[in-house]
Amino acid sequence: MPFLGDNPIEIGSGLGDYALEWVPHFSHFTATEADPGRLVALKERLGGHDSVDIRQMLLPTDEVNSYSGAVSYNVLEHIEDHVSALRSMARLVRPGGRIVLIVPAFPFAMSPVDIATGHVRRYTKKSMRQALTEAGLTIERLHYANALGLIGYYLATSVFRLTPKEGPMVKLYDRLVLPVTRAAERLVRPPFGQSVFAVARVSG
């Protein structure tokens, strides 16, 4: 993971799917989760890694720390006061460190699935830029990602009213289609996507 230094913190680790991929790349990694039940599962899953700290954290928080960076995938859309949450992330990171975010894109794609999973919003680049700027962060990268994923998600959840589940088709998409999409989007940034990707620098 670029941008994050050697001692990052993940906000909203859930069951640790991303953390398991990232841990080998850092000398130290802190995984956090707000939900007590998921925190127990997270500790069971990551507890065997000596380089990992696992702790409960709910944003916004007044905690101040000096992590080398912060990463949060598909969490900010659950938080009502997302600007205060971003300010909290900034206080956890030392000056000059980066915050890496992925959030779901486009309000028109808000579906019963989003609502059922606790989403209070979906983002555009404009709304993400506004939130990051209001939080006092300097934007370094901001773009849409996974254009094909948005089309598939919208058709599945809003047109056909399906509930996406882990299964053979999802795994096949992740294994075969997603890598090709990522490679293509490195060359040409799409004007839309399933997610907004952002990298922002903490002042100082």
Can you name each region flagged by the protein language model?
Residues 1-111, 129, 198-201:
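Conserved SAM-binding loop
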Residues 47-50, 117-120, 157-161:
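Short, hinge-like loop/turn segments at secondary-structure boundaries
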Residues 52, 121, 190:
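Residues that recognize and position ribonucleotide moieties
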Residues 64, 149-204:
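A C-terminal cap/extension of S-adenosyl-L-methionine-dependent methyltransferases
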Residues 107-114, 159-164:
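Short glycine/proline- and charge-enriched loop/turn segments
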Residues 112-131, 144-145:
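Acceptor-substrate binding/catalytic loop of class I
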Residues 134-137, 202:
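A structural motif corresponding to the C-terminal end of an alpha-helix
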